[in-house]
Regions:
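ATP-dependent carboxylate-amine ligase
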Residues: 3-156
């Protein structure tokens, strides 16, 4: 059994993560959770829960989710509620529907520091001046929002 355990341990240690799929990146004294390949309400809430277990200041950087149909506003609102319920310190939200994240978070907690932006570019510039060493930052949105550019900016 010892050899089997050693091989399994070695395999796990050598495993490489895929960009945009819950990839933990250590950069500039911060931890960035790159989960921006795609998003739906269930994966958003799960990622927010993961973020809530981090030490230090927690920052959810969320963009719109696509292809949700007529319930899109309600579903974005519920994700915002999860931000408040999970005691996330700060929400940076970008996109037309991301207003609902802000509304949902504010509804569930007055302690969330909420920053809403209409576009990713403006949000990214503000985020770069906001983050500091020790922060854990979740970056998540549907692929069309191009949030890998946010991860790149945080990593430079």
């Amino acid at each position: 059994l010892g050899d089997v355990y050693k091989r399994q341990k070695s395999g796990i240690e050598k495993a490489e993560t895929i960009a945009g799929r819950t990839n933990f990146i250590k950069t500039h004294g911060m931890t960035v959770i790159d989960d921006c390949y795609n998003a739906n309400p269930v994966s958003m809430k799960s990622s927010i829960e993961v973020l809530s277990h981090a030490k230090g200041r927690t920052i959810a950087v969320l963009g719109d989710m696509g292809e949700l149909g007529s319930d899109e506003k309600k579903l974005h609102h519920e994700v915002g509620e999860a931000v408040g319920e999970n005691h996330i310190h700060t929400l940076f939200a970008a996109g037309e529907l991301a207003k609902e994240y802000a509304a949902g978070a504010a509804e569930k907690s007055s302690d969330v520091d909420i920053h809403y932006f209409e576009d990713r570019e403006t949000m990214t510039q503000e985020l770069l001046s906001y983050v500091k060493e020790g922060d854990t930052i979740l970056v998540k949105a549907s692929h069309f929002m191009e949030f890998p550019k946010v991860v790149e900016a945080l990593s430079e």
